[in-house]
Amino acid sequence: MPKIKTVRGAAKRFKKTAGGGFKRKHANLRHILTKKSTKRKRHLRPKGMVSKGDLGLVVACLPYA
């Protein structure tokens, strides 16, 4: 049986936590930041968690995480 390939883009975007979840970065903080309020940008700064509905897709992309 050949090894399962990891999706490299997913490996760079998600980090597994001790509890089995995955950390992720929030979207909308790369460019066009002048029109976004400081509060909005501040709330986008900390890491988020992958939602329960998307967890299966992330696990399939990262077989060895």
Curated annotation (Swiss-Prot):
It comes from the Bacteria. GO terms for biological process: translation. This is Large ribosomal subunit protein bL35. Belongs to the bacterial ribosomal protein bL35 family. The gene is rpmI. PROSITE patterns: RIBOSOMAL_L35. One of its GO terms (molecular function) is structural constituent of ribosome. HAMAP family: Ribosomal_bL35. Gene3D superfamilies: 4.10.410.60. InterPro entries: Ribosomal_bL35 (IPR001706), Ribosomal_bL35-like (IPR021137), Ribosomal_bL35_CS (IPR018265), Ribosomal_bL35_sf (IPR037229). Keywords: Ribonucleoprotein, Ribosomal protein. GO terms for cellular component: cytosolic large ribosomal subunit.
